[in-house]
Amino acid sequence: MRARRVVAAAAVLLLFAVVAVARLDLDDDGDDSEVLDELLAVDEEEERGELGGGGEAAAAEAVRRAQSMVLVLDNDNARRAVEENAEVLLLGYAPWCERSAQLMPRFAEAAAALRAMGSAVAFAKLDGERYPKAASAVGVKGFPTVLLFVNGTEHQFTGLHTKDAIVTWVRKKTGAPASRIQSKDSAEEFLKKDQTFAVGLFKNFEGAEYEEFVKAATSENEVQFVETNDRNVAKILFPGIASEEQFLGLVKSEPEKFEKFNGAFEEKEIIQFVELNKFPLITVFTDLNSGKVYGSPIKLQVFTFAEAYDFEDLESMIQEVARGFKTKIMLIYVDTAEEKLAKPFLTLYGLEPEKPTVTAFDTSKGTKYLMEAEINAKNLQDFCLSLLEGTLPPYFRSEPVPEEKGPIEKVVGRTFDSSVLESPQNVFLEVHAPWCVDCEAISKNVEKLAKHFNDLGQTNLKFARIDASVNEHPKLQINNYPTLLLYPAQDKSNPIKLSKKSNLKDMAKFVKEKLQIADVETVAAGDIVKDEL
């Protein structure tokens, strides 16, 4: 089995580059297409686990034939290949890079699709780890990197790592921002292959509005744009089209399939329309689309974390709620079985993936929210509405409220207001974290300090500590541990910071001076010094 995977993996590595670089003299396009088909078949068989002994031999032969056509870039030819060809699509990769391995088969499918469309773009690959000089010369700075060179000018691909995204981007950058469809048969064939696209109907392919459409098609890097001047063709692509002579709509493969554009035909407005509407009602969060989710113009984002079987019961309800907040709030699903995706989010809340959970982020402010009510349509609707109106209280992590109080009060996120800011006492607060190297020694000194002042009968002074790794509060923004803060009773908004390098005697003197407690010298020279020794 391992040998099968090695052979199939080799096929995948070469699949993306079987289209010859233009400077290679390959006369037989039929052979190219045949090899593409063979390699794609090998990849599909491997995914289904059907690659048997005969399949291994076929894969090896397909790899051998592909090798004879592929220009592999190195330190000697990389720069020349870019300069001598009008259009070159280059994949910079590293053999150890997991993302490179994931991208290669998708890149291969894009190569096959572009080849079938008659694209003149040439494909090449570069092992950036083996040839760092070449990588630097052509602008490969990380792995994987996809670069398109058009007459020597570099364009970096930043879209989704999918076949369709790569194909759409390359066509836009090489002079085909919109596909022209002029027959019903072509429209029906297009629908078999493309699921998300913007369609424009124009009586004539000219004029200011059409030019703005083309500009938008060129600038929007991910969504395929199509154009037609035939209403019957447009109706196949967008059945709800009315009697307009000029029309623009967005088509998606989901229940909310058709979106009509009602704005002015200006590049900026068209792009905004596409950007706000291109995501589905519920976006399934993946490695591939994470960057697009983070960078979305929709800054209010509501996440549902659940196992797949739990989400099935919630999906239709969430979709219905999402319809009421289209273009305003993005609703996202994260499968908690995908630990790499879910855990970083849940850690921000101090939560475990024990049951379905709904959270929210305002990416423009960096604030987070938690829906603590039962997950149902009404509660989710109210949660989203409050988020939109700005009345939803931010969520801050907190341990459970402690039941008992000791000589040093344990403060948690939920009790920070009552225990510190609203307390009538002066509060000496130790802010620590369990992984902090210096915290243990400081904690021992704080305990001695608390005992000393308690023995003196200082009822107006309270000692407290908070573990900032699991407790948060907007008025406690600490990055260094330990941090010692004195909150005077008369001015809780301006805590006084004490150096963590202070010894026990310095701490006692600091507290007594700031709070104007009598007998400073007596205390400084008394029992507390004995404790320190």
Swiss-Prot record:
Residues spanning the signal sequence: 1-22
Q: Where is the Thioredoxin domain?
A: 51-196, 387-516
Q: What class of enzyme is it?
A: isomerase
| Glycoprotein in keyword set | yes
Q: Where is this motif: Prevents secretion from ER?
A: 530-533
Instruction: Identify the keywords attached in UniProt to this record, alphabetized.
Output: Disulfide bond, Endoplasmic reticulum, Glycoprotein, Isomerase, Redox-active center, Repeat, Signal
Among the record's GO biological process terms, what is one?
protein folding
Superkingdom in the source lineage: Eukaryota
Could you tell me the EC number(s) of this protein? 5.3.4.1
Q: Which residues are glycosylated?
A: 151
Q: Catalytic site residues?
A: 97 (nucleophile), 436 (nucleophile), 439 (nucleophile)
- Note the PROSITE patterns from the entry: ER_TARGET, THIOREDOXIN_2
GO CC terms for this protein? Answer: endoplasmic reticulum; endoplasmic reticulum lumen
Which Cys-Cys disulfides exist here? 436-439
GO MF term list = protein disulfide isomerase activity
Q: Does the keyword Phosphoprotein apply?
A: no
**Which reaction equations make up its catalytic activity?**
Catalyzes the rearrangement of -S-S- bonds in proteins
Q: Please state where this protein is localized.
A: Endoplasmic reticulum lumen
Show the PANTHER family listed in the entry: PROTEIN DISULFIDE ISOMERASE, PROTEIN DISULFIDE ISOMERASE-LIKE 1-5-RELATED
Q: Which family does it belong to?
A: Belongs to the protein disulfide isomerase family.
Role description: Acts as a protein-folding catalyst that interacts with nascent polypeptides to catalyze the formation, isomerization, and reduction or oxidation of disulfide bonds. May play a role in storage protein biogenesis.
What is the name listed in the Swiss-Prot or TrEMBL entry for this protein? Protein disulfide isomerase-like 1-5
Q: What is the lineage of its organism?
A: Eukaryota, Viridiplantae, Streptophyta, Embryophyta, Tracheophyta
